């Protein structure tokens, strides 16, 4: 297993790391078994959160007393709530100190949650502080603020020149850069492409898995990394990147409110993937998501959402595919609630 240093933190982590969002779909014991299998294969870096449906507890049970690097998150901007979140995570993770606590996609960089995490760090309960976001400008600002040791942002082989600037900035500052969405929320079906992308860059991807077969695929790539010098592979890599790049949504929400038809483009284009990473009941328990998704039928292809996207992503077709997936689950909702 390839090991790297996470910025200037001094933490040595596996280049192949694991994100725990999909574990929400698994039972407790099944999750613990899969996490331990990851550890047995040499993976030592695991990203969790206080709002991933019991993920902290699963990680804590899997690795109590083991030498792993755990990154969790506080999903609030309020001091008191963040303080309580850290206390809960310490108990759930069964540790005396958490290696990395990240602010979870906040709108403000300097907020009450940061104050709570800094206080916990002074008291020895947190070793390093990170920042996660889906917004590139916010990621750049957080990196330049001097307040954080790591940045977590959506990156994969579909990323472009703008994201390359974030990678260069973090490298120049000695910051650890963690990549969420290494498979673009399920869009990338050939893991070798993203694996090859990350092997060339000083970025640590967190792969979300929920099956041993997915772990086996990652380990196979560790043992036999794809060769970018291979002309056939390189051509396939570039062709797939061009085909998919314009449909990759980072989830930054810059398109909020621009759709004349009232579509929540940020979520409407991605909810199809959510069903395969989260418990379907989350979106089927009442009519709220059903009502939101009905607006997709009113899309006129005006392109206003494309015009405001910082990356020029075109989510019109992904939205329609997501609508079809949603309705398939909706018709079987009694199976999930």
Task: Enumerate the language-model features and the residues they cover.
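Structured C-terminal cap/extension of enzyme domains
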Residues: 39-40, 44, 165-179, 183-337
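A general structural detector for well-ordered alpha-helical segments in enzyme core domains, enriched
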Residues: 2, 34-35, 55-59, 85-89, ...
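Conserved functional loop/turn residues at catalytic and ligand-binding sites
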Residues: 10, 42, 94-97, 125, ...
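Conserved residues at the C-terminal ends of beta-strands
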Residues: 19, 49, 101-104, 132, ...
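Glycine/proline-rich, positively charged
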Residues: 29, 36, 69, 76-186
């Amino acid at each position: 297993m390839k090991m790297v240093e996470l910025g200037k933190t001094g933490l040595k982590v596996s280049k192949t790391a694991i994100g725990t969002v999909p574990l929400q779909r698994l039972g407790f014991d099944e999750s613990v078994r899969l996490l331990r299998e990851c550890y047995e294969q040499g993976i030592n870096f695991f990203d969790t959160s206080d709002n991933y449906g019991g993920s902290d507890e699963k990680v804590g049970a899997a690795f109590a007393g083991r030498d792993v690097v755990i990154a969790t998150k506080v999903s609030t901007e309020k001091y008191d709530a963040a303080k309580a979140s850290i206390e809960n995570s310490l108990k759930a993770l069964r540790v005396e100190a958490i290696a990395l606590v990240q602010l979870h996609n906040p709108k403000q960089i300097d907020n009450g949650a940061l104050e709570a995490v800094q206080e916990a760090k002074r008291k020895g309960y947190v070793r390093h502080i990170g920042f996660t976001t889906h917004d590139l400008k916010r990621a750049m600002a957080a990196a330049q603020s001097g307040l954080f040791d790591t940045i977590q942002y959506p990156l994969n082989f579909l990323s472009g020149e703008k994201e390359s600037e974030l990678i260069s900035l973090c490298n120049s500052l000695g910051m650890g850069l963690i990549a969420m969405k290494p498979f673009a929320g399920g869009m990338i079906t050939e893991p070798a492409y993203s694996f090859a992308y990350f092997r060339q860059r000083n970025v640590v991807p967190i792969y979300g898995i929920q099956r041993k077969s997915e772990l086996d695929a990652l380990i196979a790539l560790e043992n036999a990394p794809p060769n970018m010098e291979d002309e056939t592979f390189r051509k396939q890599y570039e062709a797939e990147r061009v085909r998919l790049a314009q449909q990759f949504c980072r989830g930054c929400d810059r398109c909020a409110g621009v759709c004349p038809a009232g579509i929540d483009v940020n979520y409407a284009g991605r909810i199809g993937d959510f069903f395969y990473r989260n418990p379907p009941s989350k979106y089927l328990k009442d009519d709220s998501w059903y009502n939101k998704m009905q607006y997709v039928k009113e899309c006129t292809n005006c392109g206003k959402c494309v015009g405001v996207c910082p990356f020029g992503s075109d989510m019109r077709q992904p939205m329609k595919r997501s609508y079809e997936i949603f309705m398939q689950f909706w018709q079987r909702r009694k199976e999930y609630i």
